[in-house]
Amino acid sequence: MKYNVYNDWPRKNVIFTDFTPSMIDAEEFQKIVKLLSEKVPDDVDYIVSPEARGFIWGSAVANHLGKGFIPLRKKRKLPEDAVMASYDYKTEYSVDTLEIPKCSIKNSKCFFVDDVLATGGTFKAAKVLIDTLNANLIGGVVIYNIGLKDIVRVKHLYFAELPLKK
């Protein structure tokens, strides 16, 4: 897997892992999408991913599996009347807000896809937002787990199981 690591970016004591080299290489990109897709249970209805890098991986997985894709947007990226719910959460270096667009997914099974897991805050925010819509976030997968500290437990968790090699 091709990636770059930047220490102390965007702040001191933060390790930024960039998978752009894997996206540029078409074969590598397809390989990662396939590996991520293999972790998604067959009965999942929607792939859910946070803005911004999660959109790349999540939408590719949704397309690969023929599933719907629900984008979790950053604050003020949607018109106010298009937002169903929002949730404030902590990342390793900031406090952010995720918003979920109005959609009818009641009783659906959703699966989280993102590039990196650092604190579990984004995953927790996704769980809260999906719960708000009376749907179920049944699991998640990331390419790289920087250092899971506290995670909301769900049935299918695949954090740091992909073969990450430089």
Where do the PLM segments sit?
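Active-site-facing substrate-recognition patch
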Residues: M1-V44, P101
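Short glycine-rich phosphate-binding loop at a beta-alpha junction
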Residues: V44-E51
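Conserved acidic residues
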Residues: D45, S108, I138
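Short, ordered loop/turn segments at secondary-structure junctions
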Residues: A52, K74-R76, I146
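Short Gly/Thr/Asp-enriched flexible loops that form oxyanion-binding sites at enzyme active sites
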Residues: I56-L65, K127
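Short, glycine/charge-rich flexible loops or terminal/linker lids adjacent to PRPP-binding catalytic cores
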Residues: K67-F111
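PRPP-dependent phosphoribosyltransferase catalytic core
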Residues: K124-K166
